[in-house]
Structures are given as C-alpha cells and as structure tokens.
C-alpha cells in the first residue's frame, strides 16, 4: 500500500462517514460529537495509523468509556480497518498505549486502569496477568518563602 493509497483510504472513510478533516501540526485530535478529526497529512505508515486512530475516536468502540478504554478502542478500530498494518504502525500503537498507562499511573488512583484480561493489554502487547499499580509519588511541598529565602 503506497502513501497515496493510505491518504485516499483515510479520505474515503471521512467522505463516506461525513467526517470533516482539519490540519494539525503534530499528532492528532478528534471530536466524536462534531464528527471532526485534526491530523497531519497522511504521508507514511505512521501518519496513516494516527489518522485511522483519530477516526477510531469518532467511529470506533468504547468511546463513551474512560480514557484508557477509549484510546484502546480507537487503536483497535484503526488496526481492524487499516489496508495494511506494519511493524512500525504496531510500534506506534504500543508506544501510545504505554504512554496512556504512564499517564494514568501518575494520576493514580483517580484513573481506572482496564481490568486484567481486557483487550487493552493485548493491544499494548502485554500478556493478560494481574497488575499492580505503582504507588503514587508524593511531591514534597515547600513554602514559597522557604524557596525564596532558604531555611531559617
């Protein structure tokens, strides 16, 4: 599949589904309610994967669930509809999903991780097994006066 084929595939899905495409300088964004995606031009396997992922936020499964589920659903949809899925695209998906887990762990325990055995972990490339959250890192609070004037 050539980059032009990839671009045409994304354009066809957008046309058929009534999704408006806006330019975006990096990564992508999507609005399911407004049926809009903002993406970089599709010129490679990675920009193709990202474009399909953003379309997955509009058309894919799990989009009304918490963020980690929605992200996994968008990648699942992208992988299923892609005309080709290369190792580079798989790596992009895996790195993105991994970054979402790190994001959730930093905000623990507010953010719900997908349960063990959920397809999220398979998409990430992690075998289903019990997982433990890392304990949240407590930030030491220092008063502004102490920062300005040091200890007294």
PLM regions and their residue ranges:
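A metal-dependent hydrolase signature that marks the N-terminal structural subdomain at the beginning
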Residues: 1-23, 73-76, 132-135, 139, ...
